[in-house]
Amino acid sequence: MSKGTTVLGSKNDPALGSENPTLSIQNLYAGYGRRAVLRDFSLTLNPGEFVGLLGANGAGKTTLLRAIMGLLDPASGSIRVLGSTARTARARIGYVPQKHQFQWDFPITVKDAVMTGRTREIGWFRRPKTADWIKVFHALERTDLMPLKNRPIGELSGGQRQRVLLARALAVEPALLLLDEPFTGVDAPTQSALTELYRQLAGEGVTILMSTHDIVAAQESCSRLCGVRGSLSLDGKAEDFSPQQLYAWVHGHELEGEGESTGKGGNAGTSPSPKIGVPGADGDSTGGTRQGHPAGHRITPQEVAA
């Protein structure tokens, strides 16, 4: 774990280390051209973890997902998926993009769209085998899409489209599942159903990393939350954060203790109850003060809840 990471979980939390992690990122530097987006980024994810990835626009969430999938070569550092390089292990990585990134006007059915998730395994311009269709139908069943398998994808609702993208990722039987804003544009019942399915997958040993701007959904869905500001600068159990703390962190205020060194071997020691700056009652987000407190006072979680 990188120096400067704020950790709210116990140092004995299994999320902080494993002998056989699904994903291991060490001292990663990555970006575009001469612009470094990720700097000395380290993260370990273990089998069965459901982790929310938080950060403002431009913080590095998309860059991280691209690097994990082997679509972006890092300047330095390492990414290992199941002990192999990201490119070698891509067949075991399922990716759920944002809905607008998929071509929904393409004239194919739901089952054919899900089969496109197996293109890398099958090969371009090759016909799927029976074993491929078995995996596709299993993914359709997991996502409750079997009744819609022959429907053109252009006729689907937003929630149905999100389930198609998930089924497409599940068709590769992933060990690591990457989700990019999976709750955008879906209604509450669909979000609840998807969350339950993600939890089931995690319970079966699938490691899930969900990039999202939805702080409430991340805290309600995930067991662990990580935050990126170029490097990994927030990490802990979801239950150890309040929504106010996460909102403040995403919008630029620091948790007390941020910047302190972590312990040896990447296991951080326990930290005190975090103190944060939050928007004042008058809507000013710069001061983080309340009436009766001097300028620069950092509001505690207890004061936030008051």
Predicted regions and their residues:
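Catalytic Walker B motif of ABC-type/P-loop ATPase nucleotide-binding domains
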Residues: 177-180
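H-loop (His-switch) and adjacent beta-strand-loop-beta switch element
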Residues: 225-238
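Conserved ABC transporter NBD signature motif
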Residues: 77-89
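Conserved ABC ATPase "signature" region
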Residues: 130-148
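H-loop/switch region of ABC-family ATPase nucleotide-binding domains
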Residues: 212-213
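Conserved ABC ATPase signature
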Residues: 152-156, 160
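Helix-to-loop junction immediately C-terminal to a conserved catalytic motif
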Residues: 69
